[in-house]
Amino acid sequence: MTSGPDQKVSAPDLFSAPRSRNDVVTFLLVCAVVAASFLGRYSFDVAGFTVRWEQVAPVGFVGWLIVNPGSRLDLLRTLRHPVVLTFLAFIAWNAVSTVLFSPSLGKSVAILGWLTIDLLLLAGLMSLGARAVWAENIGIRFVVPWAFAGFAMYLIANRTGGGVSWGTNFDSLYDVYVTRLSATEANIYAAILVFWTLLLVARKGTDRRWMIAAAVTVPLGLIASQTRTAVFCMVMGLAVYVGYELVRRRRNPTPLRAFTFGPVAVVVGVLVAYGAATVLPDIGTERPSPSRHETAPEVRTDTSRPAQDKLGDIDFSGGTVGFRMAVAREAAEDIQGVHLWFGNGTNTFGLRHEQPGSPGVSGHIIMLPVQILYDAGIVGLAILSAFGAVVWRHVPWRRRPIAAAIAATFIAAATLTSMFWFSVVWIILASLLRPSSRDEGETGREAAQNVVEEHPSALETTGIERI
């Protein structure tokens, strides 16, 4: 059943009334998909390929949608949605570039397969219509305990000198253990915290207790990750969100407190946590006592820097930024002639280059814009840009401010770390694209504006009842 522009739908609450077995199974599989998105570090090998649990869960979820007669038609309709088709075109172009230029199809196929799983995950969640809010609700509930656990492991790992270091990595450049928890790396851990917190902020204080809890724990998690980009992206994302809401408020008056409570709470939390980090004891100096099997204890050299130095160390000529610039220069050597337009094949940089300063280690570009240009050329970058434009067109009008904030945050973060392939990105995207629900409050003038400006989404052709 097709609904009209800005048709409000109810986001079902699984526990508010008895539901069918199909609904229960779908809900549990959505839970599994979101939970697996927090477990990016865990994987296993199959036929020489590394398979991640965050890839397995979406396959099971989409498989259920296919075999279940009640959801199969919705999924098939969603596969014709412009967002899905545009991303499919991007994958197809990557496949063409890979066949033409990749020196190892196996390495490229692994990433192409991952992108295909992302496509199916996005289509599957979109096909749920209003029920896609389940994924958003679950992710928002995960973020507080995940942030708190990350900060706890950061303190434990550094106070024990790595004696207990689960969920952390040692940054030898700054002599500090940084939190990644169950994510692939600290940058990804921090980015996940930022994205889910922004979605929580967009709820405009409807769950103030959880918002306050996030405002306390998420900044601690960012400090634990020791990721400067994440702190910057969090503040920038909040600024974009508030700025967009203020501009729109001129035409559609809304209570100022409704959309400023969350941003103010988080910014205060970031400032307090950042300030507290500067006065923490030098937690990087503690080391476990040498055992009887050790002939000499680890010696801290004069060049070692204290742990809290990392967040305040903004160095564009060396350190992390300098390393990425070195990688970009190596990549630029291959982005010439026909390869500038058509790329070098998906995931092929490591087949041609070693990591700067790490002989024998396959190179990784890490920076998403450079990665796309290297893999798929200007054509691939243009298709991906078109994908972004199509997504923007189909985001409901009331969700545009937070969509702009997340887009700006993702673009900024992607210049230093690429999480494009990870499932959390596609879960967040599906949350932005889901139909508007009745709990997304608005004033009378705003509602009238929506009827004129919001484009009807194909998500609303998934059998959701009119109300």
Feature locations, PLM:
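N-terminal signal-anchor transmembrane segment
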Residues: 2-70, 92-100
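Hydrophobic transmembrane alpha-helices and their immediate junctions
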Residues: 8, 13, 374-410
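Membrane-interfacial loop-to-transmembrane alpha-helix junctions, especially the N-terminal start
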Residues: 20-30, 74-89, 135-142, 210-211, ...
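Transmembrane alpha-helices of multi-pass inner-membrane enzymes
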Residues: 62, 198-200, 404-414, 418-460, ...
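Aromatic-anchored transmembrane helix interface
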Residues: 83-92, 104-127, 143, 147-148
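Alpha-helical transmembrane segments of multi-pass inner-membrane proteins
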Residues: 136-165, 181-248
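A membrane-periplasm/extracellular boundary helix in multi-pass inner-membrane enzymes
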Residues: 157-158, 248-313, 333, 466
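Long extracytoplasmic/lumenal interhelical loops at the membrane interface
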Residues: 314-376
